[in-house]
Each structure stands twice: as structure tokens, then as C-alpha cells.
Amino acid sequence: MGSLKLSTFAIVVCLSILLISPIEVNGWGKCDLRKGLCRLADTISTCDVPCRAVDSKYHGGECLNVGGGQGICWCCRDYDAAKSGAEKESM
């Protein structure tokens, strides 16, 4: 029975990863990079350090719920940095 729950959880996580598109989190700006799984029970965001290590444009991360006490780390950058980067790319 335990393996059935684990299999169901794995399927939910995989589908969530495939279906979730870049998001905007209130107060965080544009969150457009997934950086692995996180635990929702942690009081300190475990997403901040790995997200900052990816690139200096990311100021931290947010753990968003996918069920079963687990979440997906989304790395976030502020709106101004995202906007100025898009303007530079379009030139």
C-alpha cells in the first residue's frame, strides 16, 4: 500500500512539473526557473541559496505546493530586471 502512495505521489510531481508554466508570485516578481523539490514544512526557504547560485539575476526562490508536503522550488527575479533583460534581448 505504501508503494502505491509513493507511485501516486511521483506521478503527481511529474505531471506538475510538466504542466506548470512560469509564474508570478506576489512580492517576488517573475519566477521562471524550476530548481528541484523542496519541503513545505521548512520554516526557512530552502530555495533561496540554490536559486541565487544559478545566476545573479535571481534574488531567491519560492517553494510552491505540489501535494504531500512537497513543493517545487521556483527561482524568482524582480519585475524590473526581467523587463530590462527582455528589452535588451529585443534590441
From Swiss-Prot:
The keyword Lyase does not apply. Residues 1-27 form the signal peptide. It is found in: Secreted. One of its GO terms (cellular component) is extracellular region. It comes from the Eukaryota. Disulfide bonds join C31-C76, C38-C63, C47-C73, C51-C75. One of its GO terms (biological process) is killing of cells of another organism. Keywords: Antimicrobial, Disulfide bond, Fungicide, Plant defense, Secreted, Signal. Belongs to the DEFL family. This is Defensin-like protein 95. It comes from Arabidopsis thaliana (Mouse-ear cress). The lineage of its organism: Eukaryota, Viridiplantae, Streptophyta, Embryophyta, Tracheophyta.
